[in-house]
Amino acid sequence: MQINTYPLDLPHFEATLAHKMRAFGSQVDRTIVTVDVRPPQSGRYKGDPKANRYMQSLETFRALYPVLESQYDNLSFHEVDYSAAEKRVVSDYFLGSEEMPDKAWDGGPFYCYFQGILEADSDYVLHMDADMLYGGMSQTWVDEAIALLQERDDLLFASPLPGPPHPGGLKGKHDGADHAFDEDEVDGRVAYRFHFVSTRIFLMDMKRFKERVGTLDLDTPRLSYRLRGLLLGNPIKALSAEQVLSLTLQKHGLGNMCFAGAGDGLYSLHPPFHYPAFHAALPGLIDRVERGDIPDGQRGDYDINDSLFDFSEMRQNHARHKRVTRRLMDFVTYWSARLKAS
């Protein structure tokens, strides 16, 4: 299991790591936590304009490494290696001769995903983001997913069901999104073969990647993305890692099978917002998810919604005009620093 995280995940990390170890610890050979130590300059992934909170959180995080490694078997922390030599190794494996950028056009994580996956050094890599939650708690899902990838040569990825199962199928943002997936079947139960993959959670067949794909293409972001990236001081070479991997599936006719598996199965849940009230409620929320105490309104939806936790306060803070204001502040901060440096 390979978990991507960064210092600003600190408020929830211990609770979500313990949850992941209960869900997957007995199903995997080892667990690598990949910590991105390079803060983005702008966008929704940054900490604050001077990166003070980011670096302070990193020092606190580093103090946790030995504590958590002593608590769990076969757990290790690895900070993302941005050295020129390691970047060449990662670039050669995933891109061939092209150099991999540190960040995506929007300042989001990019290189850290691929460096972590490669460092896992396994034929099958179970990758996930640090904040993901899981219900069903099947202890056989990983073995079933590997068997499925071995059986179906039209798949590059397998993933848990996106959201708790609903008799009417997928809901939330997937409701009616017929372009994104085809309904399928795994061991007699409904499954969904997606033409997309989320970097939040997947099991990847590394041998099939090299045999069927070889290397990834870095499709140039569209002009509006490149302009925004330039204005905010981000690299403009790559779309998000998720988009790059999804376009790869489509180009090569491969898929990502989302399925629950045997028994109570396994499904994923994604928290759309992070803030103190949510982090305070997280231990109780994790307990509910693990016990299967899920309201009907949450079923079929992969994002935690208000039926399970009330995010209305945070949604108001993420209103469009406030997001635009934050981007303008990012722009002013970045170019003020550039002008001072010159």
PLM region spans:
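Well-ordered, non-membrane alpha-helical segments in soluble/globular domains
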Residues: 10-20, 49-65, 106-114, 139-147, ...
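A conserved hydrophobic helix/loop-capping motif in glycosyltransferases and polysaccharide synthases
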Residues: 1-9, 34-36
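Short aromatic/hydrophobic "clamp" motif used to bind/position activated sugar donors
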Residues: 125
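Active-site-proximal specificity loops/subdomain of glycosyltransferases
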Residues: 37-121
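The conserved acidic donor/metal-binding loop of glycosyltransferases
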Residues: 129-133
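Conserved catalytic core of nucleotide-sugar-dependent glycosyltransferases
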Residues: 105, 117, 135-229
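Short, acidic, metal-binding catalytic loop of nucleotide-sugar glycosyltransferases
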Residues: 16-30, 46-50, 67-71
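C-terminal catalytic/acceptor-binding lobe
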Residues: 9-12, 16, 212-342
